Regions:
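Carbohydrate-active enzyme catalytic cores, enriched for enzymes
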Residues: 200-206, 217-280
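Short cytoplasmic-facing helical segments at TM-TM junctions of multi-pass membrane proteins
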Residues: 1-2, 210
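Hydrophobic, small-residue-rich alpha-helical packing segments that form membrane-like cores
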Residues: 155, 166-231
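Substrate-binding groove/exosite segments of carbohydrate-active enzymes
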Residues: 2-159, 165, 170-174, 251-279
C-alpha cells in the first residue's frame, strides 16, 4: 500500500509539474479517474473487466466492449499487466475456432457467449492492441500464446468483410456507433489496415514467413485501393451506391474517429496506412 501511494503521488506530481499545456494535463488526469471508478473491476480469479461506463448505481454495458475500450490508452501504459489480461480474455476466451471475437466478454460474467455479429473496429482494433501490448511488455510468451487466435481473428475479418480479397472492406460492418456500415468506409478500412500492418510485424518477429508475406501483400493492395476509392479530393468518405439503402450511413459526411486506425499506426510506429498527404 505504501509503495502504491508513493508511486501514485510521484506520478501525479510529475504530470502536474511537467511543461504540458494545462488543458492537456486536465483532460488526461480527469479521464484517468475512470480506472479507479466502479467502471473497472476484477473477479475472483483476478481477471480484469470493465463496463463502457457507469450510471448512477449500476455499470453501463458490460464485458470489456472491444470497440469501446479500443479508444482507451491509459491502462496499457500505466497498468500493462491488466491490459494484457484483457487481451488474453479477448483472444483465448472470447474468440472461437472460426475466428469470431465476441465484442462483449460475457463468458466469465454470466456463463454465456454474447452471440452477436462481430464488430469490425473491435475485432481489427484488438489485433493492433495485441501488437501494442507486446511492444510495451516484450513478453514473447504472451505473444506466442495469443498469436494463433489473432491469426484466426484476422482471417475471419477477411472472410466477413473483404469477401473478394481485394484488400478493401466492403461488407456489413458493425461499429462503435451501434449500427452497421455498408460499402467502403474509412473507419472500418483504417482499422483493417492497422491490423494488417500489426500482424505483418508480429509474423516477422515470430518467423512466420507465410503470414508475413500474405499480410504485406494484402496491405499494399488495400492501402492503394482504399485510398483511391475513398479520397474525394478533400477528405475520405464512405463509398456506397445508394447511401439511403441502409439507415445510419454517413456517405459524404466525416466521422470524428474515422482515422482511428492511423492513430494506432502512429502510436505503434507502423507508418502511414494510406497516402500521407491525404491522411495529413
Amino acid at each position: 500500500q505504501e509503495r502504491l501511494e508513493r508511486q501514485t503521488r510521484l506520478f501525479t506530481q510529475s504530470v502536474f509539474d511537467s511543461t504540458l499545456p494545462a488543458c492537456v494535463i486536465e483532460a488526461a488526469m480527469a479521464n484517468l479517474t475512470v480506472l479507479k471508478s466502479t467502471t473497472c473491476f476484477r473477479i475472483e480469479n483476478g481477471h480484469f473487466f470493465g463496463f463502457e461506463g457507469s450510471l448512477e448505481n449500476v455499470g453501463s454495458c458490460p464485458g470489456n466492449c472491444t470497440h469501446v475500450w479500443y479508444y482507451a490508452q491509459a491502462m496499457a501504459y500505466l497498468f500493462p499487466e491488466l491490459e494484457r489480461n484483457m487481451r488474453e480474455t479477448d483472444f483465448l476466451r472470447e474468440t472461437d475456432d472460426q475466428g469470431v471475437m465476441q465484442f462483449r466478454a460475457m463468458r466469465e460474467l454470466n456463463g454465456k457467449s454474447w452471440n452477436f455479429i462481430p464488430a469490425v473496429d473491435g475485432q481489427m482494433g484488438t489485433i493492433a492492441r495485441l501488437y501494442r501490448e507486446w511492444k510495451i511488455s516484450g513478453d514473447d510468451a504472451f505473444l506466442k500464446a495469443l498469436w494463433p487466435k489473432a491469426l484466426l481473428a484476422l482471417e475471419c475479418g477477411i472472410r466477413l468483410w473483404d469477401t473478394d480479397e481485394d484488400g478493401v472492406l466492403d461488407g456489413c460492418m458493425h461499429v462503435d456507433y451501434d449500427v452497421e456500415f455498408y460499402g467502403v468506409n474509412p473507419l472500418g478500412n483504417l482499422c483493417y489496415l492497422a491490423a494488417l500492418r500489426s500482424a505483418e510485424e508480429m509474423a516477422r518477429y515470430l518467423g512466420d514467413e507465410e503470414h508475413e508475406k500474405r499480410y504485406h501483400i494484402l496491405f499494399e493492395s488495400a492501402s492503394a485501393k482504399a485510398d483511391s476509392m475513398m479520397w474525394n479530393g478533400e477528405y475520405y468518405e464512405q463509398i456506397l451506391e445508394d447511401v439511403d439503402q441502409y439507415k445510419y450511413q454517413h456517405g459524404k459526411g466525416i466521422l470524428a474517429d474515422q482515422l482511428m486506425g492511423q492513430y494506432y499506426a502512429h502510436l505503434l510506429g507502423l507508418g502511414y496506412l494510406m497516402n500521407p498527404e491525404h491522411i495529413k
